[in-house]
């Protein structure tokens, strides 16, 4: 039996460069894991079973897709029982399903004694979902391509965030489709790449008083969901240094000086799903 944590993520920045011939988009993003996590328990079994409170079909669960993808790649027909205890909300832009899938691949690689390397697990994960490869290289990475090109970085300073999620979710597919219709995508790769590295350097050094966060998906999301903009503004009023939509949403995070300040801000968001979290640093615990 194995018990594993599947950590959530936030995007400090996302630039969408272009739509690809395969229907995906080329992006460049700075992503970091946070200490909010799901818990997965893996037990040897004759067949695939997933025990969870999620009200979705087993076949649509990324954990199930990860198991099947690993079986197909290796030819192994072993089963597994997975007990999935969710803390990361669905449709939140926090990568919960993707993290669960990556955690499943890593756990079964150990449980089934497959001895696959990270590169192989990365490739299997990328065939299931675009965000999955990041979760093999925590805690912080620059992610490019459709999410399958990952550059791991180092960081030793942890930051306090307040996560606020309204009572609706946002479809990633919708967010990108709407972006295509309403936004002229930039192709200034060198400029964007430099901005991403500047942002990383600010985070690495702890100089976050005058740094800039951005998310190309925000514009179309804010037009359809004005409540997101309201949350962003309220986070600033509550003392956050900055606030941003994570991924395609619907979670917004605010960056605070410390945990005390973030907890004080909770009173502004009664009725919302909220969590005070820390960004993860090396070594992971």
Curated annotation (Swiss-Prot):
The keyword Ion transport does not apply. Its EC number is 2.7.1.148. GO terms for molecular function: 4-(cytidine 5'-diphospho)-2-C-methyl-D-erythritol kinase activity; ATP binding. The active site is at 9, 131. Pfam families: GHMP_kinases_C, GHMP_kinases_N. ATP binds at residues 89-99. It comes from the Bacteria. Pathway: Isoprenoid biosynthesis; isopentenyl diphosphate biosynthesis via DXP pathway; isopentenyl diphosphate from 1-deoxy-D-xylulose 5-phosphate: step 3/6. It catalyses: 4-CDP-2-C-methyl-D-erythritol + ATP = 4-CDP-2-C-methyl-D-erythritol 2-phosphate + ADP + H(+). Keywords: ATP-binding, Isoprene biosynthesis, Kinase, Nucleotide-binding, Transferase. GO terms for biological process: isopentenyl diphosphate biosynthetic process, methylerythritol 4-phosphate pathway; terpenoid biosynthetic process. Belongs to the GHMP kinase family. IspE subfamily. Catalyzes the phosphorylation of the position 2 hydroxy group of 4-diphosphocytidyl-2C-methyl-D-erythritol. HAMAP family: IspE. This is 4-diphosphocytidyl-2-C-methyl-D-erythritol kinase. It comes from Thermodesulfovibrio yellowstonii (strain ATCC 51303 / DSM 11347 / YP87).
